[in-house]
Swiss-Prot record:
<dbReference type="InterPro" id="IPR001854">
    <property type="entry name" value="Ribosomal_uL29"/>
</dbReference>
<keyword id="KW-0687">Ribonucleoprotein</keyword>
<dbReference type="GO" id="GO:0022625">
    <property type="term" value="C:cytosolic large ribosomal subunit"/>
</dbReference>
<dbReference type="Pfam" id="PF00831">
    <property type="entry name" value="Ribosomal_L29"/>
</dbReference>
<dbReference type="GO" id="GO:0003735">
    <property type="term" value="F:structural constituent of ribosome"/>
</dbReference>
<dbReference type="InterPro" id="IPR036049">
    <property type="entry name" value="Ribosomal_uL29_sf"/>
</dbReference>
<dbReference type="InterPro" id="IPR050063">
    <property type="entry name" value="Ribosomal_protein_uL29"/>
</dbReference>
<protein>
    <recommendedName>
        <fullName>Large ribosomal subunit protein uL29</fullName>
    </recommendedName>
</protein>
<dbReference type="GO" id="GO:0006412">
    <property type="term" value="P:translation"/>
</dbReference>
<comment type="similarity">
    <text>Belongs to the universal ribosomal protein uL29 family.</text>
</comment>
<keyword id="KW-0689">Ribosomal protein</keyword>
Length: 69
């Protein structure tokens, strides 16, 4: 799965960003569970999910800071 550009993430609505953040957190939980039970074959999915989550959280915090100012 390709990583979205930051500009694509910035075009998402707040609700979409929150939904994607929740989904990625669930995915990371599932990946950790699969790794603990030795069912995970593609460990690179951790890195991809963490990077996507970081992008979304960054855009979310930028928006929160801009509305607070």
């Amino acid at each position: 799965m390709a990583r979205p550009n930051t500009s694509e993430v910035r075009n998402l609505s707040d609700a979409d960003i929150n939904e994607k953040i929740d989904g990625l957190r669930r995915e990371l939980f599932q990946l950790r569970f699969e790794q603990a039970t030795r069912q995970l074959a593609n460990t690179h999915r951790f890195k991809e999910a963490r990077i996507k989550l970081a992008q979304l959280l960054t855009v979310q915090s930028e928006r929160q800071r801009s509305t607070a100012s």
